[in-house]
Amino acid sequence: MRARPLTLLTALAAVTLVVVAGCEARVEAEAYSAADRISSRPQARPQPQPVELLLRAITPPRAPAASPNVGFGELPTRVRQATDEAAAMGATLSVAVLDRATGQLVSNGNTQIIATASVAKLFIADDLLLAEAEGKVTLSPEDHHALDVMLQSSDDGAAERFWSQDGGNAVVTQVARRYGLRSTAPPSDGRWWNTISSAPDLIRYYDMLLDGSGGLPLDRAAVIIADLAQSTPTGIDGYPQRFGIPDGLYAEPVAVKQGWMCCIGSSWMHLSTGVIGPERRYIMVIESLQPADDATARATITQAVRTMFPNGRI
């Protein structure tokens, strides 16, 4: 999205930003145990429709009995190292990685409220595609193309149009309710890029998007993931979009939504989110806030991912 000052400072100021320089990385497998997944989501689930069965055949479902990834055993140490290195550069990191097959969650413990910038376009797309699935709106081929460009190349114009048409702040409120996102809230000034969330909420959003438990039908969720898998090297405004996950996990197939924003005080904010691996096994969210120029800030968040995954893969 275009570089613009954050106008939601009043809302963010109400939440203490936790500086996590040198904080201890944590393994939070219990946070995503099978019991928690079941208890925190609607109990009644509709029977799979043929298109859902087809999608499940294409994308293998989560395998709860899967063996832990050996590399995950070293990840807490590398997350701590990445956090410390970023802190030495003046950057504050919030990072979380989920193994969907085992439920293991590794984070640096920073659950601060963050500005989402263009990552809010996920919520706009989710709400719009659900309305289409429920027959509340009819999307033309031009609308679908605009949605694709919004997700792939971060088109602000399309986001602005869909946001206004679909009810503005109600978009975020409805998505947060369906997915149980406790830290996610609409912007106080009505500007979609000032939507706030947290790394745990964004991890949860992707996880539930992928298994359909957030309410969006799997065929519509597949539209979002397909667009994220085709994320362009630069945004429609020319801003580089390969920072963080794409350039850090260069040996993995990734589907990402990026966000960036300048002038949060004297800092640049970069947010890299998405699903990773040929079977969409992993979800990662990493956000960096750094008082530096945009190129330096992009390099910092990318280096953090490379420190965590030195071989370019999970």
UniProtKB/Swiss-Prot annotation:
Gene3D superfamilies: DD-peptidase/beta-lactamase superfamily (3.40.710.10)
Entries under PROSITE patterns matching the protein: PROKAR_LIPOPROTEIN
Record-level GO cellular component terms: extracellular region; plasma membrane
Covalent lipid sites (N-palmitoyl cysteine): 23
Record's keyword annotation contains Lipoprotein: yes
Lipid-anchored residues (S-diacylglycerol cysteine): 23
Keyword Oxidoreductase among UniProt keywords: no
Name of the protein described by the UniProt record: Putative lipoprotein LppW
Organism: Mycobacterium tuberculosis (strain ATCC 25618 / H37Rv)
